[in-house]
């Protein structure tokens, strides 16, 4: 609520939103923060007064057909699904906001309602959820091939692959989905493995026991799926006694460091 009142309408969030500049319906200032504030301002007086149905001063036919503040739903009537699904989660709006308003949390929470309560989501999101549930990565590549990139890049002999090798290690390498299945990121993974080997750092890699960190599921609103993936990874970390983790994937780094603690 304080975020809504804190907005000074400077438009910096709007100016830096990539979705807005590509013609999407999302406008962090207008279609999210100010829309929610207008909804709150219109609804709160009637809730406080206990009025069953507010009397609206109608001045036109369009207004005569308008949904009353008490009947308006935050989702659909105020903030539409099209607006919510246009967000890329880049956080540019928050980075440039002088009032430190947290736009993204509001968008994710509303997505969570759409996904977990309404069952209303784009086909692409549903496909990603299915892939994460079955193969533990957003692309649906077979989970049993998660460690194949080591052989492809010729570095299998440099890696303490768990549980096959299970030698003592100081650090656990968390590769993430992109390193396992995307050709460009495989090269980045290879570079890091060779660097760690050259530096004499003793590390282990989970391979097929590793699963997606869950970040895509949480950002898309499927909190249950995120919790399931996170719980598995945490239990696996504990299983091998990993207390120092090196992340290649930036999403995995942020999720494991900042969100698994929650």
Locations of the language-model features?
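Iron-sulfur-cluster electron-transfer modules
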Residues: 4, 30, 39-262
């Amino acid at each position: 609520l304080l975020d809504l009142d804190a907005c000074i309408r400077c438009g910096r969030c709007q100016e830096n939103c990539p979705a807005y500049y590509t013609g999407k319906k999302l406008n962090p200032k207008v279609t999210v923060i100010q829309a929610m504030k207008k909804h709150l301002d219109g609804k709160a007086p009637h809730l406080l007064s206990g009025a069953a149905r507010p009397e609206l001063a109608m001045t036109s036919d369009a207004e005569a057909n308008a949904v009353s503040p008490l009947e308006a739903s935050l989702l659909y009537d105020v903030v539409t699904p099209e607006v919510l699904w246009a967000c890329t989660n880049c956080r540019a709006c928050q980075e440039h906001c002088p009032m430190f308003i947290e736009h993204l949390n509001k968008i994710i929470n509303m997505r969570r309602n759409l996904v977990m309560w309404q069952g209303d989501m784009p086909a692409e999101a549903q496909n990603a959820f299915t892939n994460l549930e079955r193969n533990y990565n957003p692309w649906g590549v077979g989970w049993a091939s998660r460690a194949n990139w080591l052989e492809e890049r010729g570095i299998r002999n440099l890696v303490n692959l768990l549980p096959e090798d299970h030698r003592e290690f100081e650090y656990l390498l968390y590769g993430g989905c992109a390193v396992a299945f995307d050709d460009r990121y495989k090269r980045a993974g290879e570079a890091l493995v060779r660097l760690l080997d050259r530096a004499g750092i003793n590390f282990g890699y989970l391979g097929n026991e590793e699963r997606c960190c869950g970040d895509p599921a949480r950002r898309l609103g499927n909190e249950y799926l995120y919790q399931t993936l996170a719980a598995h990874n945490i239990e696996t970390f504990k299983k091998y006694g990993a207390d120092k983790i090196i992340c290649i994937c930036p999403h995995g780094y942020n999720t494991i460091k900042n969100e698994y603690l929650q």
